[in-house]
Amino acid sequence: MGNNWIDTVIKEQYQFVRLLKRTDKTEICVFRHRELGKQIVKRTLKGSGEVYFALRTLSHPNIANVYDVVKTETGVTVLEEYVDGQTVADYLQTGLYSPSGVRKVISSLCDALDLLHSHQIIHKDIKPENVMIDSNGNVKLIDFDAARIYKPFQSQDTQAIGTMGYAAPEQYGINQTDERTDIYAIGVLMNVMLTGQPPEIRLYNGRLKRVIVKCTQTIPDNRYQNVKELKRNL
């Protein structure tokens, strides 16, 4: 019933613009309001969608807003903010970031993750494609399809999800992921923004090297333990 309602609203009030992504588990489309012209993202995915239900109650300038979440027979439908801008991956097609540019992006990313981690939300897929810079220059963290809620007494994740090269070792079933998992990915992201390569191929050799090295330690206890600590060391 809920899904029929949301599909009816989309059909009556919005016009399809384009398909952003389609996999066996998710479909992401952009729609434009017929009268107001405002664009939104409609995400249909399999699974419980518990992270999106949690995100619906949160608001942060560096996180794409989730407007509504509705259960369906096979998963959930999510209506979320459309971010007009380019991803870090798009920018890297034209050149590398300066150290000051990296500090600006990562500082905002740390602010977003500080809120998420305080609600036990682990993103698990931080990479250039999931970090956007909007038309006003604001950083926006997007795509929570791989995210999970941290469970204090769980020994490991039920699913190994992430992007190879950015995923921390514990994402492959060694231990449960936690906020330090996202810190690992931030370290890889910083190195890619500065060199175009992951640290194991070409480690950045400037002042941010020590931050990257600490973020990407194999053992979580040897990394920064939270994003506040990471941000202080940028």
Q: What would you call each of these model-derived segments?
A:
Residues 157-170:
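Conserved activation segment of eukaryotic-like protein kinases, specifically the C-terminal portion
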Residues 117-133:
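Catalytic-loop of the protein kinase fold
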Residues 59-68:
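Conserved HxN/HPN-centered segment at the entrance to the catalytic loop
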Residues 15-53:
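ATP-binding glycine-rich loop module of kinase domains
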Residues 105-106:
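Activation segment signature within eukaryotic-like protein kinase domains
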